[in-house]
Amino acid sequence: MDVRRAQEIASSPVMANVTYNGQRIYIEHVDQQKGVATIHPLDNPSQKQSVPVASLEEHS
């Protein structure tokens, strides 16, 4: 995924189907300068982590 699309998803009120390492996640914030996103698994909101945006996959 690219940074622009990750930012669109993070800003959208519509939930997108995005995964990180095969796990469904929620994108909380995107740092466009660093190319990283703050995410958490849908089933564990307290497990926040920063990951490269390129490692995120969007599924339709």
UniProtKB/Swiss-Prot annotation:
Keywords: Sporulation. Residues 38-60 are annotated as: Disordered. Induction: Expressed only in the forespore compartment of sporulating cells. This is Small, acid-soluble spore protein H 2. One of its GO terms (cellular component) is endospore-forming forespore. The keyword Heme does not apply. It is found in: Spore core. The keyword Transcription does not apply. It comes from the Bacteria. Coiled coil: none annotated. GO terms for biological process: asexual sporulation; sporulation resulting in formation of a cellular spore. Belongs to the SspH family. InterPro entries: SASP_SspH (IPR012610). It comes from Geobacillus thermodenitrificans (strain NG80-2). The gene is sspH2. It holds the Pfam family SspH.
